[in-house]
C-alpha cells in the first residue's frame, strides 16, 4: 500500500544520513569489508548513506524526487571530496522506486561512474527482489552485480565477499567481468518467494 511517496522529512525523521555502515559485521557491507581486510593494504572509506527507512517503513515504497536529489547529492559530493578511488561498492536493495526516474539503481550507478571515472571498478550488491536489467550493467554504470539467491537473505554476507573478490581481481588485472541479462517470463508473489519451500525452492534450484 503506497498512499503517497515518502518525502525528505519522512526519511530524516528516522535518522540522519551518515557513513556508519562501514564497520558492519554482517550483510553486504560486512562481507565486503571483511573480505577486503583479508587482502591487506586496502583502505576502506565510507560514503554517506540514508539511515534506516522513512516513516511508514516499507509501505512507503515510492520516494519523491526531492528525496532522490538530496541523498544522491550527498553521496556524489562525498565521492568527489574523498576520492579518487580505485573501486566503489554500492550495497543497494534493488527495488527502489522514485517519482520520475524509471530505473533508480542504474541511474545511481551512472551518476557514480560519471564522477568516479571510467577506470574505477564499480560493484553492486542487491536483494533477491531487485529489478535488474541491462541498464545497470551497461558500460556507463556497474562493472559487476551480485544478487542474493536466498530468501530469507542469509547469503547477503557472501555476496559482499564475492563483490570484494571480483573488485580485487579486476584491480590486479587478473579478471575481466562479463555481464549479461535475461528476463524469463516469470512473476512470483513475494509471499511465496521463500526459498526454503516450494515453489521458490524448486525455481531457484533449477536456475542454479
Regions found by a protein language model. Give the residues of each.
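N-terminal glycine-rich anion-binding loop in soluble enzyme alpha/beta folds
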Residues: 1-77
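Active-site histidine-anchored catalytic micro-motif
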Residues: 2, 11, 59-68, 72, ...
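Low-complexity, flexible helical/coil segments
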Residues: 17-29, 122-131, 159-163, 179-185
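Accessory alpha-helical/coil subdomains and C-terminal extensions
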Residues: 28, 172-208
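Amphipathic alpha-helical segments that form well-ordered structural scaffolds
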Residues: 31-35, 111, 166, 206
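Short, compositionally biased low-complexity segments
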Residues: 43-46, 138-143, 176-182
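Core alpha/beta catalytic barrel or barrel-like domain that forms the active/cofactor pocket
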Residues: 49-51, 88-93, 180-181
Amino acid at each position: 500500500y503506497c498512499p503517497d511517496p515518502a518525502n525528505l522529512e519522512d526519511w530524516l525523521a528516522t535518522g540522519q544520513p551518515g557513513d556508519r555502515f562501514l564497520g558492519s559485521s554482517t550483510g553486504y557491507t560486512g562481507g565486503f569489508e571483511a573480505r577486503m581486510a583479508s587482502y591487506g593494504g586496502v583502505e576502506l572509506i565510507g560514503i554517506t548513506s540514508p539511515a534506516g527507512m522513512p516513516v511508514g517503513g516499507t509501505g512507503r515504497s515510492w520516494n519523491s524526487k526531492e528525496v532522490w536529489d538530496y541523498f544522491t547529492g550527498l553521496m556524489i559530493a562525498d565521492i568527489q571530496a574523498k576520492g579518487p578511488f580505485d573501486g566503489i561498492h554500492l550495497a543497494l536493495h534493488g527495488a527502489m522506486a522514485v517519482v520520475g526516474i524509471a530505473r533508480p539503481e542504474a541511474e545511481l550507478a551512472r551518476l557514480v561512474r560519471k564522477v568516479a571515472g571510467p577506470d574505477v571498478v564499480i560493484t553492486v550488491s542487491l536483494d533477491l527482489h531487485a529489478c535488474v536489467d541491462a541498464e545497470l550493467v551497461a558500460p556507463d554504470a556497474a562493472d559487476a552485480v551480485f544478487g542474493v539467491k536466498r530468501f530469507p537473505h542469509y547469503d547477503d554476507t557472501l555476496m559482499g565477499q564475492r563483490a570484494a573478490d571480483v573488485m580485487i581481481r579486476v584491480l590486479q588485472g587478473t579478471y575481466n567481468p562479463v555481464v549479461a541479462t535475461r528476463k524469463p517470463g516469470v512473476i512470483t508473489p513475494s509471499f511465496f518467494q521463500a526459498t526454503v519451500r516450494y515453489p521458490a525452492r524448486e525455481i531457484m534450484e533449477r536456475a542454479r
